[in-house]
Amino acid sequence: MRRWKHLNPSLTLEGRAEAITEAAGREGIPSIFIAVSGDQLVGSAALVRNDMDTKLDLTPWLAAVYVKEGFRRQGVATDLIARCEIEAARSNASVWYLYTELASGLYEKLGWRHLERCGYKGVTVDVMRKQITS
């Protein structure tokens, strides 16, 4: 999870593992979903209550969307995001949010709309929102 370490430098590997364990294996928020190919972990996505400590009024959030190189552009991220959206709908959410540094184009193709561009933890991010379809 080095991809996002600069956003939470104080969170240790053990802390990340604990958060994932807490979110795994249950319904609702938080939830984490993984994609596997054979015995390889190839992607992940999470549904969390809050993902930006500066926007605590917005909830829930799509977070930790990642697909391993070699498995990208095959629909893995789209499938993981769709599964998170199903879980958000089951939790009675009507809108959900995300922030991204680099993948606005992907999310726009999936129906997400820009809410704002802002600085967050030293980087510029796009905050996006999407109506949840049940």
Please annotate each region the language model reported.
Residues 5-34, 42:
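Active-site rim helix/loop that mediates acceptor-substrate recognition in acyltransferases
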Residues 108-118:
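Conserved acetyl-CoA-binding loop of GNAT-fold acetyltransferases
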Residues 29-33, 58, 124-128:
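Short beta-strand micro-motifs in enzyme catalytic cores
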Residues 94-103, 116-134:
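C-terminal "cap" of GNAT-fold acetyltransferases
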Residues 36-38, 130-131:
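Active-site beta-strand termini and strand-to-loop segments that position acidic
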Residues 63-67, 73-86:
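Conserved acetyl-CoA-binding loop-helix of GNAT-fold acetyltransferases
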Residues 32-34, 40-50, 61, 66:
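Conserved beta-strand in the GNAT
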